[in-house]
């Protein structure tokens, strides 16, 4: 059965809620994308915070509206901080999202991500290779790049969602978002989104922030994917290449509104 296409009208309504709430999003993300991630959250309407010291991370996870764990530049000290934050988020019922960057290529981060799954993420966002690997299936991948397609990883995403209780977003040319029972697809975007560093990581931050919203988590996560794809498509139409794409993307996300999405 083909997944239903996520409603842009629902995405527009969710964006209105998102901007009213402006979720305080604790981003424990990788060094390469911190600035772009923070700016993406601000442009979308959320409020970013980057707190990484273990003692502070534990404390802040209970204060934040949502938490992102991105293992892109994982170190042992950073893993300690991430573990402390997710443990506190679990206790405080702060929704947290896992971005298992390059989990299929490197053993240490794979073991770490599998350990964190016991702390019940609200959402997991990754490319096809990452989702396949996290689900325990063979995957092709070169670091953060994927050699698998999102649709090929959909059964793994559905199984992972049932196993963990998380909403799983496997993203690519078409994004698929599933809770293990219901699945929706999200279209849009542009190839330029793959020609700059950080769009996937920034998407994970917006997904994390969306998990702070009331209502259905699957719909909220799919809406976050929709906002990013619509902004990417709009920015590509105004860009001459990767260098002009990033500021155009932030502008497009900032100006995204209900009328443009319906």
From Swiss-Prot:
Domain of life, per UniProt, equals Bacteria
Q: Which residues bind ATP?
A: 125, 171
The positions annotated for binding substrate are 50, 198
Q: Which Enzyme Commission numbers does its entry carry?
A: 2.7.1.50
- Specify the pathway: Cofactor biosynthesis; thiamine diphosphate biosynthesis; 4-methyl-5-(2-phosphoethyl)-thiazole from 5-(2-hydroxyethyl)-4-methylthiazole: step 1/1
The UniProt entry's GO biological process terms, in alphabetical order, are: thiamine biosynthetic process; thiamine diphosphate biosynthetic process
Family matches, as Gene3D superfamilies = 3.40.1190.20
Q: Which residues form a coiled coil?
A: none
Q: Which InterPro entries match?
A: Hyethyz_kinase, Ribokinase-like
Query: Which prosthetic group or cofactor does it need?
Result: Mg(2+)
- Which Pfam family is one of those matched by this entry? HK
Q: Which HAMAP family match?
A: Thz_kinase
Family the UniProt entry places it in = Belongs to the Thz kinase family.
**Record's NCBIfam families?**
PRK09355.1 (NF006830), thiM (TIGR00694)
Protein name according to UniProt: Hydroxyethylthiazole kinase
Q: Which organism is it from?
A: Citrobacter koseri (strain ATCC BAA-895 / CDC 4225-83 / SGSC4696)
